[in-house]
C-alpha cells in the first residue's frame, strides 16, 4: 500500500507520496487549488502535484486524502474524488490542518491568518466553527482587523470617536474619505489584512481598541468550543501568536496540514467512518 496526501488552497498545492510505513518518497508542488472557485484550474494543479510526487513509481494500491479549500462545496469534492484513479477522500483543509496540528490528541486549534477558523478535536471527532469569509465573519482575522480599522476611521470622520494619529495616517494613505470608500469597494481580504501587522504592533488608541475587539471575538470562539474540562489551545496562522490569549494552556503544533492528510490516509478508521 502507498499513500498520497495533498494540501491545496488559494496560494498553491502540495502533495507527498509515501510508502506503506509513511516514509515520504516523493513530493510535488503546483498552483492554486480551490475547487469551489475554479474547479478546472484546481483539478489541473492537483493532478500536476500528485504526478510530480509519484514520479515514475508504479504503485498498484494507493489511498489518498486531499485537504482542499472549497471542499465544503460537495459537488466539486465528489467530482474530484470520482476523477482520481485511486480511492480518495476529499475533505476540507480545516480537517487536515487540525489533524496535522494536534495529531490524534484532544485539543483546540485557533487559526488566525488572513481569515480565521476555530476547531475542537475530542475523542477523535472534530467540530469547527468560523471560516465564513470576511463578508460573513472571519472574526479576529487579519482581514477583519484591517477592515475594523477602516470602519473606525470612517466613524472618526463622523465624530463618533477621535481621529488618532494612526487613523490620520490611514486616511492620508487613502486620500481621505472618498479614497477610503473607493478602497473598500474593491478591497480583497488580503488587501485589508496588510494593515494588521501595523495595528498589532501599535500603541495608538484606535489600534488598541481594534486589537481588544479582535481578542474578544477570539476568546468567545474558543470559549464556545471548550468542554467542561478545558483543552489546550494550539495557535496557527501568521497572526496566531500575535493574538494568542493566556486564558488556557497552550500547545505547539505537531505538524502541518500535509502531515494531517498523510496521517488520515494511513488511518484505517478514517476510511470506514
Regions flagged by a language model, labelled:
Residues 1-58, 100-108, 150-273:
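ATP-binding/phosphotransfer module of carbohydrate and carboxylate kinases, centering on a glycine-rich
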Residues 12, 63, 115:
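Broad gene-expression machinery/nucleic-acid interaction feature
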Residues 29-35, 50-90, 185:
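Short beta-strand-loop/turn "lid" adjacent to the catalytic site in phosphate-handling enzymes
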Residues 67-162:
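Phosphate-binding/catalytic loop of phosphoryl-transfer enzymes
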Amino acid at each position: 500500500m502507498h499513500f498520497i496526501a495533498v494540501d491545496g488552497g488559494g496560494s498553491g498545492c502540495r502533495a507527498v507520496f509515501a510508502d506503506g510505513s509513511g516514509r515520504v518518497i516523493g513530493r510535488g508542488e503546483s498552483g492554486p487549488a480551490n475547487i469551489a472557485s475554479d474547479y478546472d484550474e484546481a483539478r489541473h494543479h492537483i493532478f500536476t502535484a500528485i504526478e510530480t510526487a509519484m514520479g515514475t513509481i508504479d504503485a498498484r494500491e494507493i489511498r489518498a486524502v486531499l485537504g482542499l479549500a472549497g471542499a465544503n462545496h460537495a459537488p466539486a469534492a465528489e467530482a474530484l474524488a470520482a476523477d482520481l484513479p485511486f480511492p480518495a477522500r476529499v475533505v476540507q483543509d480545516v480537517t487536515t490542518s487540525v489533524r496535522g496540528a494536534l495529531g490524534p490528541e484532544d485539543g483546540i486549534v485557533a487559526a488566525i491568518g488572513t481569515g480565521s477558523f476555530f476547531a475542537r478535536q475530542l475523542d477523535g471527532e472534530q467540530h469547527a466553527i468560523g471560516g465564513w469569509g470576511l463578508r460573513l465573519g472571519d472574526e479576529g482575522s487579519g482581514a477583519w482587523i484591517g477592515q475594523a480599522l477602516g470602519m473606525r476611521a470612517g466613524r472618526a470622520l463622523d465624530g463618533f470617536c477621535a481621529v488618532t494619529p494612526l487613523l490620520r495616517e490611514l486616511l492620508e494613505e487613502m486620500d481621505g474619505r472618498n479614497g477610503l470608500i473607493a478602497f473598500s469597494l474593491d478591497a480583497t481580504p488580503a488587501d485589508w489584512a496588510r494593515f494588521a501587522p501595523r495595528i498589532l504592533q501599535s500603541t495608538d488608541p484606535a489600534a488598541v481598541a481594534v486589537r481588544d475587539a479582535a481578542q474578544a471575538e477570539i476568546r468567545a470562539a474558543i470559549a464556545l468550543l471548550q468542554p467542561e474540562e478545558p483543552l489546550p489551545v494550539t495557535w496557527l496562522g501568521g497572526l496566531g501568536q500575535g493574538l494568542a490569549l493566556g486564558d488556557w494552556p497552550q500547545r505547539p503544533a505537531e505538524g502541518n496540514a500535509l502531515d494531517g492528510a498523510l496521517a488520515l490516509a494511513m488511518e484505517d478508521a478514517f476510511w470506514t467512518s
